[in-house]
């Protein structure tokens, strides 16, 4: 079947392959202005702990080149700017112009200048040279990508030998009771919060559905191996609600 005739998941809905990117863009154009507030409300602030653990595992040092992919409002990029110093460089990249604008304004206001660039790019075809980055992170972005295999291969291409990829993403709870409670919360509370805070319940309904459709921990681990990464491991956080996958390029 050609890509033009293929369908893919947009939450629980099947849509033509080429339409998913447009629909996801609509979601994030809608929520960009309130994205940070909603993250704090939805996760009770725990997303900050998940991101802190990701940064701690990154191995980023002074002078490194770092790509924060699907970096949105720049939580990780801000910390990486401090870690790489003026000898290094951070690229905050997102496919969504609204998210990128919010991130640029936020980081500029926090004094993050001189060693950061902002690049609107599609993860499936990254516009960077081969073997360029010491570290790549993608935080809560992979599940929104249409062709995840192609995106992972693109990340592997632009990563230096010896570099690492960190994928922080919602995953599958490993405790049955937690899974049931989490599903109830996701499908009822998230759209309700979206309606109250952003006047957009549908975008947060998609969020809940996209989490359910995202590959589980073992499947994503194998996808990273298939894309060319080695020594892939993952760490469950908050009972598997979130998982951090780390893979290396040798």
Swiss-Prot record:
Its EC number is 2.1.1.163, 2.1.1.201. GO terms for molecular function: 2-methoxy-6-polyprenyl-1,4-benzoquinol methyltransferase activity; demethylmenaquinone methyltransferase activity. It catalyses: a 2-demethylmenaquinol + S-adenosyl-L-methionine = a menaquinol + S-adenosyl-L-homocysteine + H(+); a 2-methoxy-6-(all-trans-polyprenyl)benzene-1,4-diol + S-adenosyl-L-methionine = a 5-methoxy-2-methyl-3-(all-trans-polyprenyl)benzene-1,4-diol + S-adenosyl-L-homocysteine + H(+). Keywords: Menaquinone biosynthesis, Methyltransferase, S-adenosyl-L-methionine, Transferase, Ubiquinone biosynthesis. CDD domains: AdoMet_MTases (cd02440). It is an enzyme of class 2 (transferase). S-adenosyl-L-methionine binds at residues 73, 94, 122-123, 139. One of its GO terms (biological process) is aerobic respiration. Pathway: Quinol/quinone metabolism; menaquinone biosynthesis; menaquinol from 1,4-dihydroxy-2-naphthoate: step 2/2; Cofactor biosynthesis; ubiquinone biosynthesis. InterPro entries: SAM-dependent_MTases_sf, UbiE/COQ5_MeTrFase, UbiE/COQ5_MeTrFase_CS. Methyltransferase required for the conversion of demethylmenaquinol (DMKH2) to menaquinol (MKH2) and the conversion of 2-polyprenyl-6-methoxy-1,4-benzoquinol (DDMQH2) to 2-polyprenyl-3-methyl-6-methoxy-1,4-benzoquinol (DMQH2). Belongs to the class I-like SAM-binding methyltransferase superfamily. MenG/UbiE family. This is Ubiquinone/menaquinone biosynthesis C-methyltransferase UbiE. It comes from Francisella tularensis subsp. holarctica (strain LVS). The lineage of its organism: Bacteria, Pseudomonadati, Pseudomonadota, Gammaproteobacteria, Thiotrichales. The gene is ubiE.
């Amino acid at each position: 079947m050609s890509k033009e005739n293929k369908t893919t998941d947009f939450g629980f809905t099947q849509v033509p392959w080429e339409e998913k990117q447009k629909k996801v863009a609509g979601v994030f154009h809608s929520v960009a202005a309130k994205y940070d507030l909603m993250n704090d409300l939805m996760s009770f602030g725990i997303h900050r702990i998940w991101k802190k653990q990701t940064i701690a595992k990154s191995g980023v040092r002074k002078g490194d080149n770092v790509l924060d992919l699907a970096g949105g409002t720049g939580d990780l990029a801000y910390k990486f700017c401090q870690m790489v110093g003026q000898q290094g460089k951070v690229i905050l990249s997102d496919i969504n112009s609204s998210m990128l604008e919010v991130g640029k304004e936020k980081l500029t206001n926090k004094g993050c200048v001189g060693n950061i660039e902002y690049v609107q790019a599609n993860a499936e075809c990254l516009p960077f040279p081969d073997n360029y980055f010491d570290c790549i992170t993608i935080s809560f972005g992979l599940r929104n990508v249409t062709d995840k295999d192609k995106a992972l291969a693109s990340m592997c291409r632009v990563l230096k030998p010896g570099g690492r990829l960190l994928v922080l993403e919602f995953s599958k709870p490993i405790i049955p009771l937690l899974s049931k409670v989490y599903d109830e919360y996701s499908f009822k509370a998230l759209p309700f919060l979206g309606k109250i805070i952003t006047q957009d319940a549908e975008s947060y309904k998609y969020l809940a559905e996209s989490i359910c459709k995202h590959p589980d921990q073992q499947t994503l681990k194998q996808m990273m191996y298939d894309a060319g990464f080695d020594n892939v491991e993952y760490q469950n956080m908050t009972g598997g609600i979130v998982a951090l996958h780390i893979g290396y390029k040798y």
